[in-house]
């Protein structure tokens, strides 16, 4: 089965939604599921469940490309000599520690979450709840100075605590970046360091989630399914590059409250539409 023009447009739109919402703390999975309620892909439910996760690989690639110098643990002086960047290695060990809680909980409860919590009402409630949290936390932080200003300042204990907050993002509508940023802000991490650690944490977390979904689905793709994945990931990559640049520039001068208000408004709209 070949993709028709309308289906290609749907995939492009979903890629745009993924690229925008993956890095802003507004829940990419929640937005993808909501969009699917109105613009449904003509694919099996099993494929769509996998697609909504694996499309994140495009967004991951954008982070790797943009933060390569910070992420790559080696620095080459010349063709035959390289220097190990100890701070980068240390940071990756901290990221690994932060990944453990969500990896365990994701494997244990993936089927339950997919079966019971992927609903518009759950998404709406989580959008509103975490929107309120963003506003409350940012108002509280006006009178406080961050105790952890840079990535290098993040301790193993802080990394683990951020990882525990990431578990909350398994509930659709929460937002992986939203949960980790809220957790980081609560324990005294600066906005910029919180966002950067979230980007680092996204790489193994989303690679692991994508691999898990691919293994569950199997690798027996039709040509249409494979094309859907490629288009979705390519669009998500391109859009993510611009969104990451915007977010890092934005949070240097502004707080996250605007995203909190957006979440609240969207959550209320979803509840109203669902009730009609």
From Swiss-Prot:
Gene Ontology molecular function terms on file: undecaprenyl-diphosphatase activity
UniProt GO cellular component terms: plasma membrane
Keywords: Antibiotic resistance, Cell membrane, Cell shape, Cell wall biogenesis/degradation, Hydrolase, Membrane, Peptidoglycan synthesis, Plasmid, Transmembrane, Transmembrane helix
Entry's localization field: Cell membrane
Induction: Transcription is activated by the regulatory protein BcrR in the presence of bacitracin.
Tagged with keyword Cell wall biogenesis/degradation: yes
Transmembrane segments: 6-26, 49-69, 89-109, 117-137, 151-171, 181-201, 224-244, 256-276
Stored Pfam families: BacA
Record's catalysed reaction(s): di-trans,octa-cis-undecaprenyl diphosphate + H2O = di-trans,octa-cis-undecaprenyl phosphate + phosphate + H(+)
Recorded topology in the membrane: Multi-pass membrane protein
Top-level class of the enzyme under EC nomenclature: hydrolase
GO biological process: cell wall organization; peptidoglycan biosynthetic process; regulation of cell shape; response to antibiotic
Purpose of the protein: Catalyzes the dephosphorylation of undecaprenyl diphosphate (UPP). Confers resistance to bacitracin.
Other information: Bacitracin is thought to be involved in the inhibition of peptidoglycan synthesis by sequestering undecaprenyl diphosphate, thereby reducing the pool of lipid carrier available.
Protein name: Undecaprenyl-diphosphatase
